[in-house]
Amino acid sequence: MLIEVSYFEGGYIRKISGYIHKVDTNEQYLHLYEETGLFKIRLSEITEIKCLT
């Protein structure tokens, strides 16, 4: 399932699209596969998640 994640970084809202690899509840990260590889986002920085497919 392809998703778009909006997240807060450096005072701006950024967006990234990809596929969920895993949610690490111990470290509080979302691991996301995107075009250039694996991307990690802190759960506390996520502002919105949309399903694209």
What do the predicted segments below correspond to?
Residues 1-53:
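Conserved RNA-binding domains used in RNP assembly and mRNA/RNA metabolism
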